[in-house]
A protein has these predicted regions:
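Sec/Tat signal peptide C-region and signal peptidase I cleavage site
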Residues: 21-27
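Mature extracytoplasmic or organellar-lumen-exposed domains after removal of signal/transit peptides
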Residues: 28-426
Length: 426
């Protein structure tokens, strides 16, 4: 990704200002312009996420109407395409409470998939932390939640979101969103750190030649989850529209808006992506710790997270229809204040993107992400570690940018995997 280096003349005066809090009116306007464009890009990204989710929903309709290998593959392909713009929105999660409070409905993971459907015996039959570990709501029209019988005869969107999602207060009870749909399309990946993704047969939805029973309820669940994904993304698209709640919140105070941008960049880079999504799985050599674990699409999701982080700095975004958005950006703001710091930030973002692209290329041509993190895979481990190192290194420069813009103390997300690795094994 090439970061735009064209400086706007109005930003030149920033170099002489001592602190953002004391900027003259015209420079404050420039900070406001950066935040405004940040919100505009958010709206475009969520709108693209909505568009691709609608395409996924249509593909699911076509699959359920005529179950077969081709229609199932088309639904899987639509799911993978839908992940691209959504993962590029994740940089908006941290620093924007409206997004953080909402995102668990669409991208929560990992999930205890036995809540939803049948599982292999290797999954186990119980969990000390989750009484619904093998509830299999598709097979059971009544389930117990907090010791009480709950009617599960209708697997409606309202039931999934209002009753089943995080049932019993357990975060692993993920009933909605991309990963619930992923499980219903692919099934469990039973290959460990060996090759291969989930292999759910299309006949799991074939009412005339049903496998694993309850094909009608499985279809009902899949359609309800897809319907919810569309409606949830519509909500966030509206929140980032001009005058939407998220837009109003971030634009109300330009300085706080800049802090939100950098909080997103730093927290996603360090604690969430480098730590929880990558280093943890690498330390444990555990395929269950990969983000898109049923589909083996994890390397693409991580790459698009990194693209989103870089875009939050550059202000650039290429929409799913090919339209390119550019505008006032942190890159411009930092370059006008400290050219060397901007060059450092740009170089580190690009180095991380190079490492992520190398990981994605390996995922496409040699081995999938769950194989890369396998124990004893020195070369694969090193490819993943290089991407982690890039994320950690760019976070250090994000912290320098925060200081240069005089944004005060910003607490970025951490991770035991990075900060206290011994705790991971306790």
């Amino acid at each position: 990704m090439k970061l735009n280096r064209n400086l706007r003349a109005a930003l030149a005066l920033l170099a002489a200002s001592a602190a953002l809090s004391a900027l003259p009116a015209h420079a404050e306007t420039d900070a406001a312009a950066v935040v405004k464009h940040y919100a505009e890009v958010a709206h475009a990204k969520y709108e693209d996420s909505l568009t691709t989710a609608k395409a996924l929903d249509a593909a699911i309709d076509a699959f359920l109407a005529a179950p077969g290998d081709a229609t199932l593959q088309a639904a899987k392909d639509a799911w993978i395409k839908a992940r691209v713009p959504y993962q590029q929105t994740e940089v908006y999660r941290f620093g924007n409470p409206i997004v953080d409070d909402w995102e668990g409905k669409v991208n929560a993971w990992p999930l205890d998939e036995g809540l939803i459907d049948y599982v292999d015996t290797s999954y186990g039959t119980e969990s000390d932390e989750n009484s619904l570990y093998v509830a299999n709501v598709i097979a059971n029209k009544t389930i117990k939640i907090d010791g009480k019988d709950v009617d599960a005869s209708k697997l409606t969107p309202e039931f999934l979101s209002g009753t089943l999602q995080e049932a019993g207060g357990v975060e692993a009870n993920v009933a909605t969103g991309y990963h619930a749909i992923e499980f219903l399309l692919w099934g469990q990946d039973l290959n460990g750190t060996g090759p291969g993704a989930g292999k759910r047969p299309y006949t799991d939805y074939d009412l005339k030649n049903c496998t694993h029973d309850n094909c009608d309820r499985r279809a009902e669940y899949l359609k309800s989850a897809s319907t919810l994904l569309v409606s949830d993304l519509q909500e966030m698209t509206d929140d980032w529209a001009p005058g939407g709640e998220a837009t109003k919140h971030v634009e109300a105070d330009p300085k706080a808006g800049l802090a939100a941008i950098l909080t997103g960049m730093g927290s996603l880079s360090y604690g969430e992506l480098a730590g929880e999504r990558m280093k943890l799985g690498l330390l444990l050599h555990d395929p269950e710790e990969e983000h898109d674990c049923f589909s083996d699409n994890t390397y693409n999701s991580h790459l698009n997270d990194a693209i989103g982080i870089a875009a939050a700095y550059s202000g650039e975004y290429t929409r799913v229809d090919g339209t390119k958005l550019t505008g006032p950006s942190l890159h411009d703001l930092v370059a006008a204040k400290d050219k060397a710091l901007d060059e450092e930030m740009t170089a580190k973002l690009n180095k991380t993107l190079d490492a992520m692209n190398a990981m994605a290329k390996r995922g496409e041509t040699i081995e999938k992400y769950d194989q890369m993190i396998g124990e004893g895979n020195t070369e694969g481990n090193a490819v993943v570690q290089a991407a982690i190192d890039g994320l950690i290194d760019q976070t250090k420069t994000v912290e320098r940018v925060i200081s240069a813009l005089d944004l005060g103390k910003i607490q970025l997300e951490g991770s035991d995997s990075l900060d206290n690795p011994n705790a991971v094994f306790q």
